């Protein structure tokens, strides 16, 4: 993967939430492509415990909250995969779109939509300054710029797969 920030987003929107096995297979196939800058996985969260109500503090044993392996990197999937945003270098976009469509047809058990555009922030935001402080630009990976939540721990929300 490249560490450049001049990229175009490709949003893959399956018509159903993906199971961990399907998400793992799809992510591994996407990461095989050249010119991928970053991949974001979005969807409803799968909590590890009940956070409110009478059962507060009780552990949630959800079968979809489990570890998956992408490019040899194992991490816990904390969301039901509802959309995947792939950041690609502009020069590789046109030639890779057909390959992405073939991968999606092969891996996804449902229909899907693909959108091309700008779906993520690529410039430094106020939230980045709140999270990292002043003069952080040279100290962090440019792929994480614009992806932070100032109140969360980065190790809980971002997995860096190389």
From Swiss-Prot:
Transmembrane residue ranges: none
Keywords: Methanogenesis
Any single GO BP term: methanogenesis
Pfam families xref list: MCR_D
Domain of life per record: Archaea
Oligomeric and partner information: MCR is composed of three subunits: alpha, beta, and gamma. The function of protein D is not known.
Name assigned to this protein: Methyl-coenzyme M reductase II operon protein D
Organism taxonomic ancestry: Archaea, Methanobacteriati, Methanobacteriota, Methanomada group, Methanobacteria
């Amino acid at each position: 993967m490249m560490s450049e920030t001049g990229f175009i987003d490709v949003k893959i929107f399956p018509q159903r939430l993906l199971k961990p096995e399907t998400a793992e297979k799809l992510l591994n196939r996407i990461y095989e492509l050249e010119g991928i800058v970053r991949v974001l996985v979005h969807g409803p969260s799968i909590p590890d415990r009940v956070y409110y109500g009478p059962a507060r503090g009780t552990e949630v044993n959800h079968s979809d909250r489990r570890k998956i392996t992408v490019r040899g990197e194992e991490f816990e999937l904390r969301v039901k995969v509802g959309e995947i945003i792939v950041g690609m270098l502009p020069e590789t976009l046109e030639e890779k779109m057909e390959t992405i469509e073939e991968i999606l047809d092969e891996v996804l058990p449902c229909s899907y939509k693909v959108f091309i555009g700008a779906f993520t922030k690529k410039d430094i935001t106020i939230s980045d300054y709140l999270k990292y402080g002043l003069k952080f630009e040279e100290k962090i990976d440019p792929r994480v710029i614009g992806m932070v939540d100032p109140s969360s721990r980065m190790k809980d929300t971002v997995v860096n797969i190389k």
